Amino acid sequence: AFALKYVDNHREGFKRLGITGEWENPYLTLSPQYVSTIIRVFAEIYQTGAIYRGLKPIYWCPNCETALAEAEVEYADKTSPSIYVKFKAGSPVPGTSGDVYFVIWTTTPWTLPANLAVSVHPDFDYSAIKAGNETYIMSSFLAPTALEAMGITDYETVAKFTGKDLENLTYRHVIFPDKVCPVILGDHVTLDAGTGCVHTAPGHGHEDYVVGMKYGIAPFSPVNKSGVFTNEAGSYAGQFVFKAN
């Protein structure tokens, strides 16, 4: 009834504007004829094997507990918390020894429980930088800025690679250390800020989802419809995601 009320309002408005049309035979997506046609065509497509069930990240309102269309999303400048995180390498990194870490930077710390990969750009230069007893892998270009932000002033470069050299190396999840995740390649990685090593959570972002699909990494989102972490988030279970920041 609500939708049909506004159909009538629109129709009368168009008539007053002098617009011609089949006003008594409107094109309505809620009409039984339209719905039955969609079902029939969908069935034909299904029979070709082109339909499958999967998961992907979408815009979601935790207050309304409903999906949002792109047209409903508005962006505003805001200050977000950011964090540098080191993921301990799970496989040998050429030219290094001891404790080696891939360092990421993110402005969405709450997505870290859903981390499933670290993305690097295949063509960027990366360095292994030793500081004390630890070695950090990050973009050669961004390293000075990142190290300064991390409060590290005494360091040396012990090895260099391209992103392609790092593909398929592994690391241990920072929250779930028994989980081993891969280093993958992604053209979405930039040198605008951060470390050139990008925290990748396919269940929380479109670019992460796309690059994850290329590597067969299924999206994972330990968050319920109210924006609260589920038991899959470990010690963060029960917290609203933004408060977890």
Residue ranges and their predicted role:
Residues A3, V7, V35-I38, N245:
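Generic structural signal for well-ordered, non-membrane alpha-helical segments
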Residues A1, T29, N231-N245:
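Aromatic/His-enriched, Gly/Pro-containing loop or helix-boundary segments
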Residues R16, T20, P32-E232, Y236:
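NTP-handling and nucleic-acid-processing catalytic cores
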Residues F2-F14, I217:
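Structured alpha-helical segments in the cores of large, soluble enzyme domains
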